[in-house]
Structures are given as C-alpha cells and as structure tokens.
Swiss-Prot record:
SMART domains (UniProt xref): HOLI (SM00430), ZnF_C4 (SM00399)
GO terms assigned for molecular function: DNA-binding transcription factor activity; sequence-specific DNA binding; zinc ion binding
Protein's recorded name: Nuclear hormone receptor family member nhr-13
Family in the record: Belongs to the nuclear hormone receptor family.
UniProt cross-references to InterPro entries, sorted A to Z: NHR-like_dom_sf (IPR035500), Nucl_hrmn_rcpt_lig-bd (IPR000536), Znf_hrmn_rcpt (IPR001628), Znf_NHR/GATA (IPR013088)
C-alpha cells in the first residue's frame, strides 16, 4: 500500500489525479486499465519479472497480470464498470445527464417507469442510444459493439504477429520465449544496437514479407483490384516505417532521447546528430560516398524524431496504436485508388474510426478529447510519410545505398507521379 494517502493504491503514482475509481483510490491510468480489462474481458499471463511484477509507476514495464491482481486485491469491483445496459439507466435532461434513481422507494420507481412507457418507444430508444459522448458513431446496438471488438482484436493479432517476427529476426529472441507470451513491442527487455549508417541498406526482404502478411490480413485488402492492392501495400511499408518507429521509441521511453527504428537499432538524439552539411564535415568521413550516404540518411532520421516526440506525448495505448496505423493506411491511400478501391477504403476507415472511438471510451474519462487528440496525430504522421516516400525514391533512384531489389520495385511507382500525400484532417 502507498505511504501517501493521496497516491494510487495500485501503482503508487501521486501525479495522476488519484481518486476513487470502481471502489478504490487509483490513478486515471490504472482506472482505465481496469475498465478496459473488464469491458473487453481480457486475460493476461504473468511475465515473471521482479521489477515489472512489483507494479510501481517508476517501473519501465508493468506486468498486466500482477497489475490486475493488485486491482482486485485493493477492492476494485468489476461490477462497477458500467456496461451498455447500465449506461441506459441515464436519461438526458437539457445538455446534461442524470441518473434515474428513486430516493422514495419502489413506488416512485414504478411511477417513473409508467411515465416512460407512455412516451413514444422510438424516441425513448433513440434517447438512450445517443446518451454516450458525441463521437463518429454512438453505439446503437450490441452488434456494433461486437463489431468494434472484433476489429480491435483483428488488428491486435496482426501487430502481434509482426512483433513476434521482429523479435525473432532482429532481437534474436529464442522461439520458446516468443511463443510464451506476446509483447506490445518487439524489443522489450532486449538490448538495442547502435545504428551504423555504413551498414544500413534500408528495408530488407524479410521486412517486405512480414509487411505483406500484415497487408493481406487487413479486412478489405483482398477485395481490391491488382493496381489498388499494390499501391496499398507500398503505402503500408511507408506507414509501418514511420508509426512503428514512433511507437517503439515511446515504449522505450522518450526520456532516453533515443530514436528506435523498426530493426532494433537506435540513434542517440542528444546531442543532436550531425547532418553532414556542417562546415568541414567532409573531414570526418573516409570517402565521398560515405559522406553522401550520411547526408541522405541523417536528415531522414532527424525528421522521424519530429514525429516521435509528439507521439510519445500522446502516450497511445497499444490498441490505439494498432488502429491508428490502419486508419492512416486507408486515409492516405484513398486519394490514389480507383472508385471501387475508394469505396472499400472509406468503409474500412470508418469501421476503424468507430473501433478507435470505442477504445477511447474504455480508456478515457473524456472520450471526445482523447479521440480528437489521437485522430489529430494523423497530421504530423502523414507529413512524415511524405518525407519518407521522397527520401526512399531518392535513395533508390540514385543508388546512394545498396538497397534490396524489392526496395527499388517499391519506389518505382512514385517516380512517375506526385509524391504528395492526402491533405491533413
């Protein structure tokens, strides 16, 4: 138990507005974790690590199994997590919501029920269905809620598969450990390697294979024609490069000032790395080719850091990250697809947006603010995607780096068209 009476009884945090949630004094983060776990009926396995299992806000990683156990131990009650049926026990008066509660006994309750039954049933149902915080879509039925949960689960599995492959390929994690339990990012508790521009060859064939599996697993991808599916796949590669690096950097801890790339390498960002354009920078390199390669890669990396900083401040949950990544793919690709492809893209994007709103509803007390902040992240992510695409084209076209042939094929279509992305939201 925490020594500070105002701190969270789960993680001992005293800086996150601790107050009573679900029957115990907890911070907002632990309350959101408990609400999401109960609402989505999630099960966890203990990772059996002393620092993580002690469940403390100072720990870099917190075991979710032990965190949930501690929530139960301090008296947090799953029954207090409001289900959809319980939310319907609120009625709208003017612009606010009040609880339908009888303080005089069953007679008043029965009278109120009779009055409600006299109302138009369609208006009553509509009122209850729209009582939730305004968003892209209120949840009008249990079917919509089930669809949202199915969408979340689908993309969690897709990202988990990619995470496992990167752990095997780049972190050299034994397969027995990979199969033991899933991770939210591939390099958790794994040593990172310093980035070496001399050894960098861009994305490898292994990367293209795992991204292909991810793309094919996206609902709607197999419904597109050949040209649309090729463009969508190429865009997934760019989105994965940008947003996964931002998420891995956030999970590593932005306070370390290290940019983590998808291949498990990192670049210290303090002091700010050189770009190769400084005065007399050529004296630091053995050859002109090394200087050109450095000048090509480092501005790309510095631009990526500009995405990582606000993304870490957003502090997305794993579910928000997975859904935002897919939303970005469909939103950007929409403007370059055929008419049939656009219909698929808009349907899938809207489905993902509804699922994201559902996740924000489970995680945050202020759903509208949280949902808006997550969606606004698309702006700076898409700006970086445009920069990455331009850099990939230049690298492949001029042969500055000895990249894989798949990389040349990946960027060939951008050589013939404008590299600008979709307008921001």
């Amino acid at each position: 138990m925490p020594t500070n009476p105002n701190s969270c009884e789960v993680c001992s945090s005293s800086s996150n507005s601790s107050c009573n949630h679900f029957g115990a004094r907890t911070c907002k983060a632990c309350a959101a974790f408990f609400r999401r776990t109960v609402s989505m009926k999630l099960d966890y396995q203990c990772i059996d690590q002393p620092d993580a299992c002690r469940v403390h806000c100072d720990s870099r990683v917190i075991c979710r199994f032990c965190r949930l156990k501690k929530c139960h131990d301090i008296g947090m009650k799953p029954l207090l997590v409001k289900s959809k049926n319980e939310r319907k026990n609120y009625i709208r008066i003017s612009k606010g919501l009040i609880r339908k509660r009888s303080v005089l006994g069953d007679n008043v309750k029965e009278n109120s029920e009779e009055i409600q039954n006299d109302d138009d049933p369609q208006e009553s149902d509509a009122e209850m269905e729209n009582e939730s915080t305004p968003g892209p879509s209120s949840e009008p039925s249990e079917n919509v809620s089930a669809e949202n949960q199915e969408t979340v689960t689908k993309f969690l599995k897709l990202e988990a598969s990619m995470c496992d492959r990167r752990r095997l390929l780049y972190a050299e994690t034994p397969i027995s450990i990979v199969l033991e339990s899933g991770k939210e990012w591939p390099y958790e508790n794994a040593p990172l390697k310093m980035f070496d521009y001399k050894l960098s060859q861009g994305m490898s064939k292994h990367d293209f294979v795992m991204i292909m599996d991810y793309a094919r697993g996206m609902p709607g991808f197999d419904e597109m024609n050949y040209a649309d599916s090729v463009f969508c796949y190429r865009l997934v590669c760019a989105v994965d490069f940008v947003i996964n690096s931002a998420y891995y950097t956030y999970k590593r801890g932005i306070e370390h000032n290290e940019l983590v790339l998808s291949d498990g390498t990192f670049i210290p960002m303090v002091p700010t790395p050189l770009t190769g354009y400084e005065e007399n920078a050529n004296l630091l390199f053995q050859s002109q080719d090394d200087l050109m390669k450095f000048r090509t890669l480092m501005p790309l990396i510095l631009h990526q850091w500009e995405t990582c900083v606000p993304f870490a401040q957003l502090a997305p949950s794993h579910e928000e990250f997975c859904l935002l990544k897919a939303i970005c793919v469909w939103h950007v690709s929409y403007y370059r697809l055929s008419e049939d492809g656009r219909r698929i893209a808009i349907a899938q994007r809207n489905r993902l947006i509804r699922a994201l709103h559902h996740v924000c509803h489970l995680d945050s007390d202020d759903v509208g603010e949280r949902f808006g902040n997550v969606m606004m992240a698309l702006n700076y992510i898409m700006v970086n995607i445009r920069h990455v695409v331009s850099s990939f084209v230049m690298i492949s076209f001029f042969g500055i780096i000895n990249v894989d042939k798949s990389m040349i094929s990946l960027t060939s279509f951008w050589n013939k068209s404008d590299t600008s992305t979709a307008p921001s939201l």
